């Protein structure tokens, strides 16, 4: 690389390598963002389930899977204690209000992580776009 008059000269190979690295980073960040969003939705669903159990009538329909392909009809679920995932495979049997607080904290952490990942993703996409524009201009100049 050479620098003169505030202009930097970079080889096309370096730009292509940088674009490839950014593309891989973008793919990884998108995957991570999707996983965090899925975890966030799961935490929200868990909170909704706790609220549903607390206010249940006689019968309750619970989804046996994530998509609701199988529903279970349940009667009279004891609502004094629930099991909540503490992470790393550990669960605690606690009162629903405590579980809701834990889920609120988890939701807050996931929202913060989602914002951080989204910001990193936007930066990577902007950098990739700039490199792509430079490569397009270089290709047009070579064609002339």
Curated annotation (Swiss-Prot):
A molecular-function term among this protein's GO annotations: unfolded protein binding
Transmembrane segments: none
Domain of life: Archaea
Location in or out of the cell: Cytoplasm
Keywords, in A-Z order: Chaperone, Cytoplasm
Predominant place of localization: cytoplasm
GO cellular component, one term: prefoldin complex
Entries under InterPro entries matching the protein: PFD_alpha_archaea, Prefoldin, Prefoldin_subunit_alpha
GO biological-process terms attached to the record: protein folding
UniProt entry tagged with the keyword Signal: no
Stored SUPFAM superfamilies: Prefoldin
Family: Belongs to the prefoldin alpha subunit family.
NCBIfam families: prefoldin subunit alpha
PANTHER family according to UniProt: PREFOLDIN SUBUNIT 5
Function: Molecular chaperone capable of stabilizing a range of proteins. Seems to fulfill an ATP-independent, HSP70-like function in archaeal de novo protein folding.
HAMAP family, per database record: PfdA (MF_00308)
Subunit description: Heterohexamer of two alpha and four beta subunits.
Record-given protein name: Prefoldin subunit alpha
